[in-house]
Amino acid sequence: MLNIPEYRNYSGETKIALMDNSTVAFLEQVERAGISAKELLIGYEVILIPNWISEEICDSIYRKNFIESLVAEGLPIYFIAEENYTDLANGEEGNLYKIVFAAVSTLAAMRSYLHRHVEKSDSLDMEEYAIWLSKMYQNWPLSIITTKNGREKKKNAGEISLTILAEVFSWYYPNIESITMYTQDRDSYDYQTNARNYLRDAFKNKVSVDVSYKSND
């Protein structure tokens, strides 16, 4: 695991960045080329890496050491466990389910899994979020590849986690000034865009914060 602090509760941050594995790989190469990655990330009050993505980062000792070195240099980089998203959503697990469903709304296998294994006719009968999320990750409906170090790499898990986290911040904290997603993956943009369109109908009485993107383009 990454040897960096864990983020558990929102503390009023107004400039938030979310980062995926592809961006970490790119920035590590930038650093090797003599360009300060730290300078590119200054200005955010918190930079978050979901735990599913931290597992991907740790597939490479170079990426792992790079992130830990940025933390040692003072950048506010934290990992966040997906099970703790419920705390960010004020414990409103029904709404959190809607956000998860929205994040996977373009993936038929994921939708089918949620309909069959998570949804109940009465939402009060659903298992706790942390329980059904853990089961979903253990029984991942999309393809799984075993990496050289023996880890099971679950297709699109990181992108889905980023989308869920972005939407939780967006819909629950209207005073946030900016949410920036660092990714080189087009899927992340598509998932988040579709999730936003879905949630506009689900959360008609809420105001959302826009999510912006940065890549190496």
Spans of model-derived segments:
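Active-site-proximal, substrate-binding regions of enzyme catalytic domains
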Residues: 2-177, 187-217
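Short beta-strand/turn micro-motifs composed of small residues
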Residues: 182-185
